[in-house]
Every structure is written in structure tokens, then in C-alpha cells.
């Protein structure tokens, strides 16, 4: 199950580490029609090890950095259960391969999709302020923190946030 809704509130105001959001409904609507046709009924493999590039940061924060791998297969295009709108359900961190495509075709297709998802006209940047709260629908947005705040990167700023996530439905 994915997380239906996520909310985050600042406790120690970060100087950097803005949050980026990308609209996956609009990403689907504006995606090249040839790519849409190619992926509309396909599934992709998602892996928890996609975040392994953070392992050194985990080691500094947690003291170990051990990460177990979990993988799952999800539709690339899902239907939002409340709006009925089609949304892209892939992301550059966790999506590793399109099922029923060879590696080269999968990599090329995913690269085009990921570049499309990052277009400025599909994204917004949320700048944290004292006691700010951000709440989003995980089913229809791609989100990530700009990682310019980790202590090991020479900035040394504390980032403390409270997070809540509400379990959602299975992607379909």
C-alpha cells in the first residue's frame, strides 16, 4: 500500500532543504502521445534500494546505514481512486525497470518520463518557514527534498521535522 496523504511540519527551521512537488496528473496529460501509448498498460518494478545513494547520510544520522531491499511491481499509469484521473506512478528514485521491455528500451523510456516529470511547468518549490506545514496527496504528486542540508555536506544545519502519513489504497 502506498501512503494516501503525507504531512510534514518544521520543528527546527531548515535554512535549506526546500521541498519540490511535481503534478503527476498533469505529467500524464502532457506526456508525448507515443510514450503514453507505449506505457499505458505496462507495469514497472520499484525497489527500496533506489534510495541507496542516501546510505552515507543514513550512516551519519543512524550510525549504521544498513538498508534492506524491498521490491514491488506497480502499474506505470494508475487511476486516482477519488478523481478518476490518470496519473503517472513512476519516479527516478525507486522505479528501476519497465516489465516486458528489455533493459535498453526500459532505461530510455524511463529517462524520457523522468525528464518530463521534472519540467518546471509541472513543478512547484515549497520553501520552509517557521512552523510551516505541508500536506500532499502521495497518489498524485512526486515529491523530494532538495538535499543541501546534510551535516556532512559542509553546511551543518539541523533539520528536525514531524511527519505523519496515512495508509492508502493499492495502486491500480
Model-derived features with residue positions:
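Single conserved hydrophobic/aromatic residue that forms the stacking wall/gate
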Residues: 1-11
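Non-heme Fe(II) oxygenase catalytic core, chiefly the N-lobe of the double-stranded beta-helix
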Residues: 12-133, 138-172
Amino acid at each position: 500500500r502506498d501512503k494516501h496523504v503525507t504531512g510534514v511540519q518544521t520543528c527546527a527551521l531548515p535554512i535549506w532543504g526546500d521541498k519540490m512537488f511535481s503534478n503527476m496528473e498533469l505529467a500524464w496529460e502532457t506526456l508525448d502521445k507515443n510514450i503514453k501509448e507505449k506505457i499505458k498498460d505496462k507495469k514497472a518494478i520499484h525497489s527500496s534500494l533506489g534510495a541507496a545513494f542516501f546510505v552515507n547520510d543514513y550512516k551519519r544520522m543512524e550510525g549504521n546505514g544498513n538498508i534492506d531491499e524491498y521490491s514491488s511491481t506497480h502499474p506505470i499509469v494508475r487511476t486516482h481512486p477519488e478523481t478518476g484521473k490518470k496519473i503517472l506512478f513512476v519516479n527516478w528514485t525507486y522505479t528501476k525497470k519497465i516489465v516486458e521491455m528489455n533493459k535498453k528500451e526500459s532505461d530510455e523510456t524511463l529517462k524520457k518520463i523522468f525528464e518530463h516529470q521534472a519540467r518546471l511547468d509541472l513543478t512547484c518549490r515549497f520553501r520552509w518557514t517557521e512552523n510551516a506545514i505541508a500536506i500532499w496527496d502521495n497518489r498524485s504528486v512526486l515529491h523530494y527534498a532538495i538535499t543541501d542540508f546534510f551535516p556532512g555536506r559542509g553546511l551543518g544545519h539541523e533539520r528536525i521535522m514531524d511527519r505523519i502519513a496515512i495508509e492508502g489504497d493499492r495502486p491500480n
